[in-house]
Amino acid sequence: VSITDDTATAKNPFISPKMYRELVKPYHARLGEIAMNANLIIDMHNCGRCEDFIEDWMDFGVSMWNPAQVVNDLVGIKKKYGNKLVLVGCWDSQGPVGWPDATEEFVRSEVRRCMDTFAPGGGFAFWGSVLGSQDDPSVKARAAWIDDECTKYGHAFYKTH
């Protein structure tokens, strides 16, 4: 089950944790209760810097978060929750990897860095992408490098970890 809601911008939540707990969490908790009673996995889709709400999500059974965006303290979150919360993403699609002049080696090294940082111990699903028109050759090339490196490095990584 996916609960899709946004409570934050890239800089901060746009609703206080107190207001979230009073106004939104009861509805999310009801959805979580239904999903847990049916033994379903709960994925929270929530963009932006929304790390302030993770404890609340855990209260109603969320076990996956996408997209876990780099504006959050993802290393701290990974350390705190380990594999109890699957971080889906952890990729900066708007940073240097997304720039048209990003080199193949840089893009590939970022895939490896992301996997090396978040994959150990489980609780991680790589989700890398490049923003832009799929007709743009630069976007196509960077997306292909990401996919290829994820496949090659990911297979090798999980064989040894």
Please annotate each region the language model reported.
Residues 1-161:
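Active-site loop segments of alpha/beta catalytic cores
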